[in-house]
């Protein structure tokens, strides 16, 4: 077993504005032999120069440069060179709060079979850092079955497939051949597979991750039809992974229902916030896959049986929210 507990993998591409703040937030709690692996995805700005200027003298900060292939490919390359027992995928424009490494260390010492470490996260606006809101909020805590953690997140509406949402034992990736496959939505299948393949999770109520929302991204980032179709394909692939899992039957049935409802809502909201019609293939998926689901509320019944009415009602809510965003 490696003496290195944690490898933090940071995929970087043209993030000269953010990389120092990100790495500095990690260095406050990471010392050798733990390591920070910066995977330079062929940046064309000053990212590499800044990393060399600030961190070339630190043994725990390592940088590798690869041909441009997207964040998922960069994470895969980072896993290949990582020497830690655990890996943590951190985005280069975000910030990690103090305490993550110390709690992880204590958990692994007390519960050595833990292979997934989950924590809360928040988001903040780049132009107004004092404006923050919860991102991932766990309702469970302590030692848990990872599939129960996933179900609870789906139920409370704070599940995200983002790979920065957990710390993972590296052998899980190796034994199950987990990889980030695509440039876009590359983490959907990976993250769900993580929750399904892991055997023991520790859930803390501490908020250790702070996601930066760049200026204008809430309202001004128009998404193309290709984006929505790729997002839909990621949903289908991930749902198929869930259906093929070997989870206990009642739990699997509950996870399938929760994941479908979560995904249907999310794809609808993505279109509404983009101020574009919900694609017909999404509506067809709701009509076809929704037939296997028994609604637990009026809102779920509308979503599954009359998606057009559900969309109309939610569109009024979204329009009001967009008007409030300065």
Predicted regions, residues:
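Acidic helix N-cap motif at the loop->helix transition within catalytic regions
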Residues: 18-20, 45-53, 95, 99
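Short, acidic, metal-binding catalytic loop of nucleotide-sugar glycosyltransferases
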Residues: 24-33
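A conserved acidic beta->alpha catalytic loop
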Residues: 25, 40-50, 68, 91
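Glycine-rich, basic loop-to-helix element that forms the pyrophosphate-binding segment
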Residues: 66-82, 92
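Donor-binding/catalytic cores of nucleotide-activated saccharide
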Residues: 71, 92-202, 212-226
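Short aromatic/hydrophobic "clamp" motif used to bind/position activated sugar donors
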Residues: 87
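Catalytic core of nucleotide-sugar-dependent glycosyltransferases
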Residues: 208-215, 221-249, 265-292
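Membrane-interface aromatic/basic loop that binds lipid-linked glycans or pyrophosphate carriers
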Residues: 271-326
């Amino acid at each position: 077993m490696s003496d290195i507990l944690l490898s933090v993998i940071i995929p970087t591409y043209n993030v000269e504005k953010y990389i120092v703040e990100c790495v500095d937030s990690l260095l406050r709690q990471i010392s050798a032999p733990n390591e920070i692996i910066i995977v330079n995805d062929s940046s064309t700005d000053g990212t590499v120069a800044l990393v060399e200027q600030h961190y070339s003298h630190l043994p725990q900060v390592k940088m590798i440069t690869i041909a441009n292939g997207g964040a998922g490919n960069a994470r895969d390359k980072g896993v290949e060179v990582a020497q830690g027992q655990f890996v943590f995928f951190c985005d280069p424009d975000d910030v990690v709060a103090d305490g993550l490494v110390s709690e992880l260390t204590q958990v692994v010492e007390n519960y050595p079979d833990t292979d997934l470490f989950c924590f809360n996260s928040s988001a903040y606006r780049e132009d107004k850092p004092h404006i923050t809101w919860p991102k991932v909020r766990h309702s469970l805590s302590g030692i848990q079955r990872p599939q129960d953690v996933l179900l609870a997140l789906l139920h409370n509406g704070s599940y995200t497939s983002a790979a920065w949402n957990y710390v993972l034992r590296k052998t899980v990736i190796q034994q199950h051949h987990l990889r980030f496959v695509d440039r876009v939505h590359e983490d959907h299948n990976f993250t769900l597979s993580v929750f399904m393949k892991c055997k023991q999770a520790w859930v803390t109520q501490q908020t250790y991750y702070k996601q930066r929302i760049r200026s204008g991204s809430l309202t001004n980032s128009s998404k193309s039809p290709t984006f929505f179709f790729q997002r839909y394909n990621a949903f289908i692939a991930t749902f198929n992974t869930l259906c093929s899992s070997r989870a206990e039957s009642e739990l699997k049935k509950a996870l399938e229902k929760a994941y479908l409802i979560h995904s249907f809502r999310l794809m609808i909201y993505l279109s509404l916030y983009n101020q574009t019609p919900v694609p017909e293939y999404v509506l067809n998926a709701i009509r076809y896959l929704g037939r296997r689901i028994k609604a637990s509320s009026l809102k779920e019944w509308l979503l599954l049986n009359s998606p057009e009415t559900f969309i109309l009602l939610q569109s009024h809510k979204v329009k009001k929210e967009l008007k409030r965003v300065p």
